[in-house]
């Protein structure tokens, strides 16, 4: 087991799909899921070459053989540089991620990893197309004997400074940052996110790199198009998010509240279920929602980002159903997917039954 794999940091007894590890080159190519390259057979390598399956998304974490073996608990993990040379020789590309575990692969080890990876960012078809640096995510369900510690504010600021120094160097050499920090670093460090231009064409958006800045950009563009001066009848709504985005989303709430007759309150929650002080929205569970909202004045309803729910079903990560949460809170809940749906729901309040109908059509 990889000690920092989120799948291995879950409680037992939940739905089967939560424990599925998709270390599969086909899923990596099709959906952008990350694989380690440690489990591929010779036939699979041949298939990748023959069918030119590229780009792949690869969890690197470290390029020093012993350190990567220690991190991935796999004796073949030390071959990563050989694998990259193999891909480079065939003009096949990857997007890389490095999950930083304090006191293990940070500091000089992180610098070594990033410089090694960037050495493959050369030529017309660079083997390493982009790199994401991500903080390790820990839950209270992980084994207590592991060697992992959470990322502190001080550590986040240290990594930001280290990576930004390298980015400056790479911009001069390549005309691109090449590597990017996941949004969580800035949230943990409590510093401002980089501007929109920093993320170029968002090559690592699926890894949480620039997703907040992109959401803010899309919100402002859509709000300009859709928000009226006033609405009737007036309504008051609660918008639930993970507390990781609380500061970044305050200007969006102010913009919504400029509409006469519309009042939106942002409620930012952490997850006691996972045992996290800082939580991204997608990891909030039914238990977290109930604990955070019970006893509050929820007005005319709750705006709930649908990424908290299983795709195609109104079920949270802890297997509590949305209907259960509605029944206990005794208030309408409006699952919203994306910026446009969020704003339109504020203006029209599509009922939960419409959401269930939509689920049934998928």
Segments from the language model and where they lie:
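Conserved Radical SAM active-site core
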Residues: 1-124, 137-166
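Structural preference for beta-strand elements that scaffold enzyme active sites
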Residues: 55-57, 93-97, 130-132, 178-180, ...
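Auxiliary Fe-S-binding modules of radical SAM enzymes
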Residues: 120-125, 132, 138-362
